[in-house]
């Protein structure tokens, strides 16, 4: 009898734990579309040279001066990775235009470079020394599947990955989506863009020497589906936009799983400022991601400390059939938000009202 009683008590305890976990998860995935929007949109803020038009872009970051904005755009083309067709002109591989652009605080173009060096720029990251890192996505004609480090003036300083060769070895990528450099110089690459590409994070030292990799395709803790963007908080934790799983995953720098957040919708871009405010861009809900209906596209703002969403900037395009709203997001020292958009082909600026 005592054995049976203990067994029943144990089963009830397990059930209670599962119930609490289920309740917590249910609370975490409550839609956060109704948070207030204290921002006003500014279109056409960044000024391109006469005759040049914006291409698709999700690659945007802030210079170490805190106000200048760096962008890697796809050379005037509409070029999401899913549209890549062998043998056809595609993005920057067939363009003489420089894809890496730097704008001052007034939106004036002050620097550009990278012509002929990139195929599909998917992420731009400015490290603590001001160097410019680009994750160059899908390969074409012997190029790409690489991460490239440029000096602030456009000199190639380091290249990771094999040009045009997709793989999952320690010196290979398959459609790298994002790169981030830690304060100590360690390099983290989010490697993969869905389909038959990879689903992992790769870590290198500051010289580009392979350290480790973690993650695989799946939806469990530590697994990934389209690892799309990276950010780091003041505690040194990595935040991954795990887009295919509609969540943000949190890891330590050794790859140990910490947590997962669903309240930031379907994340394409993620940025954390010096005050540990997190900004997450959703460019696909109710358009490309039909399985995420009910969630609204836009930029969600929240706190790293507790994950609470405090503001929501909705997509200026109410109805869309393709990727829309910001796919990349960044914030300057004054708190202005910049959203890089693939579908509408533009860079939006949002200022507090």
Which ranges hold each PLM region?
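N-terminal secretory signal peptides that target proteins for export/translocation
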Residues: 1-7
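Residue-level detector of intrinsically disordered terminal segments
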Residues: 7-10, 28-29
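Eukaryotic scaffold repeat domains enriched in small/polar residues
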Residues: 27-353
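Bacterial N-terminal signal peptides
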Residues: 9-23
């Amino acid at each position: 009898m005592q054995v049976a009683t203990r067994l029943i008590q144990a089963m009830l305890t397990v059930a209670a734990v599962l119930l609490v976990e289920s309740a917590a998860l249910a609370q975490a995935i409550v839609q956060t579309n109704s948070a207030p929007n204290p921002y006003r949109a500014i279109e056409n803020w960044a000024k391109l040279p006469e005759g040049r038009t914006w291409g698709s872009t999700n690659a945007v970051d802030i210079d170490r001066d805190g106000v200048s904005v760096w962008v890697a755009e796809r050379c005037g083309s509409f070029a999401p990775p899913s549209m890549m067709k062998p043998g056809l002109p595609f993005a920057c591989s067939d363009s003489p235009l420089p894809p890496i652009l730097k704008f001052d605080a007034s939106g004036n173009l002050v620097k550009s470079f990278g012509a002929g060096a990139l195929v599909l720029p998917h992420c731009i990251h400015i490290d603590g020394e001001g160097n410019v890192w680009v994750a160059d996505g899908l390969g074409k004609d012997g190029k790409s599947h690489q991460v490239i480090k440029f000096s602030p003036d456009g000199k190639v300083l380091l290249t990771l990955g094999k040009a045009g060769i997709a793989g999952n070895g320690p010196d290979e990528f398959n459609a790298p989506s994002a790169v981030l450099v830690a304060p100590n110089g360690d390099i983290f690459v989010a490697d993969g863009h869905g389909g038959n590409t990879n689903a992992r994070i790769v870590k290198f030292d500051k010289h580009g020497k392979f350290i480790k990799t973690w993650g695989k395709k799946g939806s469990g803790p530590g697994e990934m589906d389209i690892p799309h963007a990276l950010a780091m908080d003041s505690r040194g934790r990595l935040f991954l936009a795990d887009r295919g799983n509609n969540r943000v995953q949190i890891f330590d720098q050794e790859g140990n799983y910490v947590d997962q957040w669903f309240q930031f919708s379907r994340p394409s871009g993620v940025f954390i400022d010096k005050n540990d405010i997190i900004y997450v861009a959703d460019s696909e809900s109710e358009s490309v991601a039909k399985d995420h209906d009910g969630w609204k596209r836009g930029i969600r703002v929240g706190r790293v400390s507790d994950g609470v969403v405090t503001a929501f900037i909705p997509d200026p395009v109410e109805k869309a059939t393709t990727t829309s709203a910001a796919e990349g997001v960044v914030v300057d020292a004054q708190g202005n938000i910049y959203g890089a958009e693939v579908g509408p082909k533009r860079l939006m600026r949002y200022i507090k009202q």
